Amino acid sequence: MWGMWFTLVAVKLHVGCAMWTYAPWQGRYLPHSLSPRERLRAYATWCNAVEGNTTFYATPALDTVKSWAEQTAPDFRFILKLPKPITHERRLADVEDPLRAFLAAIQPLGERAHSLWIQLPPSFGPADLEALAGFLRRLPYGHRYCVEVRHRAFFADPRSEQRLERVLAEAGAEWVSFDTTVLFEDPPVSDAEREAWMKKPRLPRRSRALTGDPVVRYIGRDEEARTVAGWQPWVGTVAGWLREGRSPTVFIHTPDNVGAPGLVRRFHDDVRARVPEVEPLPEPVPSGPPTLF
């Protein structure tokens, strides 16, 4: 049913990074002179989506969220992570108050808050699926939801995988595909890769979409060629989703993330080579040389 709309509407692929400001990007992707409150506006000329990782650590102030909305186009996408007290500390139980506060805080984003991202801890396994199902049933309408699991059973045990898919499908929620296969193909060769090896989960590539809005998080290596070679299966998968009329959001990471904005645009170009109907990304704001004043 997805493919019937492909030729009738504009085709847009949303791509982005794990953050919108990062010191190594100053002067390379973002102008040196920008204040912190203007960096999202510049980032949004490179990418049309961003992971909302900061919301995991604290619910943002209303004025902060209003600033995010003012700096981005109406079709820019934030995939916002639910706060840690909801997912990790209370494990989805008795979370009405923090959830209500979070939803009120992000209201100024409107449709820019494209999906709310429920990242669950590695200890959240098949035995906890009833808690997840109950939580998803209680969530308000008007938002899209995507769930990231890290417990190995969901990837190694077909029965557990199918049970999780049923829970998500009943709620209309997506399964976030977090692909770390390239990161763990070979031993790390840089400090950033060694740190990523310690912190990131070993998860397989999972390319099955449950909804019309798939979410992919891909992490490569610090060597650009390794990262590009590793994402080739995703180019085909994402192109296929677009042809089916789905609307994916793809995030490109590397352990050091130094070249992430450029890699994001390269991935977008690779998909456009397969699906020429995809709209081009915005023209990036010139970063300019460093200045003394």
Feature map (PLM): residue ranges:
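Residues lining hydrophobic/aromatic ligand-binding pockets adjacent to catalytic sites
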Residues: G3-F293
